[in-house]
Swiss-Prot record:
The modification N6-(pyridoxal phosphate)lysine is found at residue 227. Keywords: Hydrolase, Pyridine nucleotide biosynthesis, Pyridoxal phosphate. The gene is kynU. InterPro entries: Kynureninase, PyrdxlP-dep_Trfase, PyrdxlP-dep_Trfase_major, PyrdxlP-dep_Trfase_small. It catalyses: L-kynurenine + H2O = anthranilate + L-alanine + H(+); 3-hydroxy-L-kynurenine + H2O = 3-hydroxyanthranilate + L-alanine + H(+). It comes from Burkholderia pseudomallei (strain K96243). This is Kynureninase. Catalyzes the cleavage of L-kynurenine (L-Kyn) and L-3-hydroxykynurenine (L-3OHKyn) into anthranilic acid (AA) and 3-hydroxyanthranilic acid (3-OHAA), respectively. PANTHER family: KYNURENINASE. Pathway: Amino-acid degradation; L-kynurenine degradation; L-alanine and anthranilate from L-kynurenine: step 1/1; Cofactor biosynthesis; NAD(+) biosynthesis; quinolinate from L-kynurenine: step 2/3. GO terms for molecular function: kynureninase activity; pyridoxal phosphate binding. Its cofactor is pyridoxal 5'-phosphate. Coiled coil: none annotated. GO terms for biological process: anthranilate metabolic process; L-kynurenine catabolic process; L-tryptophan catabolic process to kynurenine; NAD biosynthetic process; quinolinate biosynthetic process.
Amino acid sequence: MKTREEALALDRDDPLAPLREQFALPAGVIYLDGNSLGAQPRAAAARAQQVIGAEWGEGLIRSWNTAGWFALPRRLGDRLAPLIGAADGEVAITDTISINLFKLLAAMLRHQARHAPKRRVIVSERSNFPTDLYIAQGLIAQFDRDYELRLIDDPADLPDALDDETAVAMITHVNYRTGYMHDMPSVTQTVRQAGALMLWDLAHSAGAVPVDLNGALADGAVGCTYKYLNGGPGSPAFVWVPKRHQRAFEQPLSGWWGHRAPFAMQPAFEPDPGIARFLCGTQPIVSMSMVECGLDVFAQTDMHAIRRKSLALTDAFVALVESRCAGQPLKLVTPRAHHQRGSQASFEHPHGYEVMQALIARGVIGDYREPRILRFGFTPLYTRFVDVWDAVETLRDILDTEAWRAPEFATRAAVT
């Protein structure tokens, strides 16, 4: 792609192009931050009005039954399941990634303590998203026995970090900063052969790249719905537990929604035999209902078509940045190899924060991550090839004119 006309031609031939019309995208904005917060499906506003105005406003408490609120975490989990290689009854939409990670990691450690008590080590990556590491650290602090969080600095170091004391490997499939994507089947096999359990974080994978959790024989996973799945800001996350583990995994947040018969009001907790045991308290129905609007769009295509366009978009973006912005101090930190790349492109720049603020001021919205990383997410449901061209041209102008040096772009916002 060497001209804007070529970009427009690619958009005309794009089989996913009609899906863009199902999103409410503001005029004059090129949105390359769907890896942080997905765009709003047009159906979301009407769905919110239905839930608030009709189901809550008129149905009141009856809507737990008549509008299907009570079954919503499991019903939407079944709708999400095909996107991550899961079966019906294996996914629940609930809580946040952090909370679900606490539940699932604790369940895995408890399982290992019963069957292999010597295994007290959690292996993860130092570059993992911080909340994953914080949750592991906080969980370890709750135990009265010696548990350890062992961090590796390179994916190639994983085999050497696994031993007969490893309980769980907790890995994020696509790295939030660089976009590096692990080989899920290979990593899972390595971990399981070492006798450990494999826990995947799919925050930057679900809805972005094809995932086959059951095919890989993974042991558990968590993920969010507000990024590529377009569920809305703060929309509930999800937890996946394969059926082979559901009865054996006991999570510690034993709230009433995880009880086998919540409305029996029994004084002793008896976990649900299925995925519902990973629920805890009353669910956020309004925000959870919005998740379905994003899933409705995914139902009109498949992950392989999304992946083909994702790779084409990121290939074009990287090539254009390196040609149109040649001579600028930009360093690609995202893998070039397709099998190692998620759906983002990240570049390091000495003044990355200021450059990103200048881009946002001109309507090109990406985001910034420490240290010095310009991060661009590509969401094939609504990102166009002409967006790629125009974004790079804006970046080139900002760098050539040093517009990023304006004082206002150095002011740090609370959210970057």
